[in-house]
Amino acid sequence: MRTEPLCGASPLLVPGDPYSVVVLLQGYAEPEGVGDAVRADGSVTLVLPQTRGPASSHRESPRGSGGAEAALEEAARGPILVDTGGPWAREALLGALAGQGVAPGDVTLVVGTHGHSDHIGNLGLFPGAALLVSHDFCLPGGRYLPHGLGEGQPLRLGPGLEVWATPGHGGQRDVSVVVAGTALGTVVVAGDVFERDGDEDSWQALSEDPAAQERSRKRVLVVADVVVPGHGPPFRVLREASQPETEGGGNSQQEPVVGDEEPALH
């Protein structure tokens, strides 16, 4: 197995059915000045259902057992934002969304991969969206619902769309979003489980639980054809021809669509 950068400027579009993935803003982490100062911001990714459902019913709080699961699946019928970047990137985020024809009020679900300010600093732009931040899920208005997310117990949002517990970097409550069925195979939006492609020299120093994060990294690499890391361009996961294909993986050779070009859905 090896990895290689998926080249292209933001926004980078990977068409899919039933969900397409748009990397709106590529994260970065760059040394600044002397000492250990770093200027950084997290990647921001949009997951778009091919067919959008009505945007009203997800705002109502479901009753009874299975409420969180039903509410999550309902919220996933509209645009899903994975991380929001830091508050200093507010205008860049709004501009990137507008470039996709999405207003803040159109977003029905925001997933925060972990609780660091460079990843969830713009939650206030989306008061009408359901929020899944780390392991906390709430509906608009602050109604929190219990759910079964845990290591080895994913939350299903829709066909080929899941949230996984991927602990390590920020502690025990980090999550990743797994999108199967794209033109490039399975895309995993991994937050800071991966800082960037080729981060083997640095990720452990930034991890609250390196052992847990190592397990999370291995789990992601088993299924991913493309990884969207927290602070760098997306990268491909390339397997030897003799390796068995994993569920959702196809290692498609189709290239993503970059910039303002229209994706050709297949």
Curated annotation (Swiss-Prot):
Q: How does it assemble?
A: Homodimer.
Q: Quote the Gene3D superfamilies the UniProt record gives.
A: Ribonuclease Z/Hydroxyacylglutathione hydrolase-like
> Tell me, which GO biological process terms does this entry list?
histone mRNA metabolic process; mRNA 3'-end processing; positive regulation of G1/S transition of mitotic cell cycle
What residues bind Zn(2+) 2, as annotated? 118-119, 192, 231
User: Where on the tree of life does the source sit, at the highest rank?
Assistant: Eukaryota
Q: Which InterPro entries match?
A: MBLAC1, Metallo-B-lactamas, RibonucZ/Hydroxyglut_hydro
Q: Which reaction does it catalyse?
A: a ribonucleotidyl-ribonucleotide-RNA + H2O = a 3'-end ribonucleotide-RNA + a 5'-end 5'-phospho-ribonucleoside-RNA + H(+)
Q: What is this protein called?
A: Metallo-beta-lactamase domain-containing protein 1
One GO cellular component term of this record is: nucleus
Q: Which SUPFAM superfamilies match?
A: Metallo-hydrolase/oxidoreductase
Its function, per the record, reads: Endoribonuclease that catalyzes the hydrolysis of histone-coding pre-mRNA 3'-end. Involved in histone pre-mRNA processing during the S-phase of the cell cycle, which is required for entering/progressing through S-phase. Cleaves histone pre-mRNA at a major and a minor cleavage site after the 5'-ACCCA-3' and the 5'-ACCCACA-3' sequence, respectively, and located downstream of the stem-loop. May require the presence of the HDE element located at the histone pre-RNA 3'-end to avoid non-specific cleavage.
Species name for this entry? Homo sapiens (Human)
Pfam families per the UniProt record, alphabetical: Lactamase_B (PF00753)
Provide the family line. Belongs to the metallo-beta-lactamase superfamily. Glyoxalase II family.
The cofactor(s) it depends on are: Zn(2+)
Could you tell me the gene encoding this protein?
A: MBLAC1
Keywords tagged on the record:
Cytoplasm, Hydrolase, Metal-binding, Nucleus, Zinc
What residues bind Zn(2+) 1, as annotated? 114, 116, 169, 192
Q: Using the chain's own numbering, where are the disulfide bonds?
A: none
Co-factor note (free text): Binds 2 Zn(2+) ions per subunit.
Compartment(s) where it occurs, according to its Swiss-Prot or TrEMBL record: Cytoplasm, Cytosol; Nucleus
Domain notes per entry = Contains four of the five characteristic MBL-fold metal-binding motifs, with two waters completing metal coordination.
GO molecular function ontology, one term from the record: metal ion binding
Region Disordered, as annotated, extends over 48-71, 229-266
This entry's Enzyme Commission designation comes to 3.1.27.-
